[in-house]
Amino acid sequence: MLSPTNSTSKTAPVPPRDSSKPVLISEEPRNQLLQKVARTALAVLLVVVTLGLILLFYSFSDLQSFPWCCQTHPSTKEQPTISIPVPLPSPPLAVPRPSTPPAPTPAISRPSTPSAPKPSTPPPLLPKAPKPVKTQENLFPLVPEQVFVEMYEDMARRRIIEALVPAWDSDIIFKCLCYFHTLYPGLIPLETFPPATIFNFKQKIISILEDKKAVLRGEPIKGSLPICCSKENYRRHLQGTTLLPMFMWYHPTPKTLADTMQTMKQLAIKGSVGASHWLLVIVDIQARRLVYFDSLYNYVMPPEDMKKDLQSLAQQLDQVYPARNGQKFSVKIAAKEVIQKDSGFSCGAWCCQFLYWYLRDPFTDALNDLPVDSVERHENLASFVQACEAAVQDLPELSWPEA
């Protein structure tokens, strides 16, 4: 029996170490070296990334303004002094002094120039004249307070007048003419729908006088009949009439008859007066006279031009409707000034008021007796308007009175 110590089992032989190949770096120091290299590379990468982010948010000019960048002078602990350049001709700026006597303040100098010591007693300098500045007061003259007071009074006056006298349309004007016919049968109440205009009033006057001459001769009339009057009644009116009140509707914008009628329709649809205006031409057949009335005096054209235009019409009427005694038609411009002051809606009422004055006394100029004050003048007109509106309440709508 064999003992354990003398066992016959074989183990692998251990090869002997080669003494000719020495070990340079052991495993543990090598790992430490790799870690140091990795940390150094990571630190360099972080620095590069940080600088890149700084360059993204700051331009090169911003980096130059930093005290640690691009400085050629040696760094000192004193902060750089910022000096403001001042033009040489200007006097030195006066620096306010505190209550306690401080050290003398150095004068402001140009950059890169040593500041000169401030003299203890500077010579007196003449004050420089200030440069004139263009302000609102220089550009626009000051408006006296009285002007604002007058403007306020004018506005208040206009409101009072507009409340006194309303705007008259063609309907109320025609009713007023019908009422005047009951007072003065020689007046023919010509329709105002559609009214005459500055472009066709001459033709309408000539046509009416030709129809009157035909009626007196017993001939049929050639002109168009009124809308709201029978043929027999119209012939009776023409036979007995001695005065034609031709109301004209005027607007400064249209330049033709068609445009005028279109503008009239548009304003009627809107229910607005706009810039429209009523004019009156009285054809006094008995006195052989044309009387023109414009409450705004020269709203349509200068009175001299209108007078020449009416004189041309008068020559035509002398041929169309000659007088037995050979008397010619004369022309008169009634208004010598603006009658309709401080009011934009009373033109129709003023035309009716002037016609009423003319019917009462055609040879007396009632415009000379008008009050100077516009409010008092329109108060008198308001009394006439109220009387007319009360008188025409019982008249039928759009119907001629029987002649």
From Swiss-Prot:
UniProt KW keywords: Hydrolase, Membrane, Protease, Secreted, Thiol protease, Transmembrane, Transmembrane helix, Ubl conjugation pathway, Virulence
Active-site residues per Swiss-Prot or TrEMBL entry: H277, D294, C347
The EC number(s) this enzyme carries: 3.4.22.-
Alphabetized GO MF terms: cysteine-type deubiquitinase activity; deNEDDylase activity
GO biological process, one term: proteolysis
Ribosomal protein found in the keyword field: no
Region feature (Disordered): 1-24, 77-132
Polar residues bias spans: 1-11
Skewed-composition ranges (Pro residues): 86-105, 114-130
Membrane disposition: Single-pass membrane protein
Disulfide pairings: none
Transmembrane segments: 40-60
Annotated InterPro entries: Papain-like_cys_pep_sf, Peptidase_C48_C
Subcellular location(s) of the protein: Secreted; Host cell; Membrane
GO cellular component, one term: membrane
Function: Effector proteins function to alter host cell physiology and promote bacterial survival in host tissues. This protease possesses deubiquitinating and deneddylating activities.
Protein name in UniProt: Deubiquitinase and deneddylase Dub1
Underlying gene: cdu1
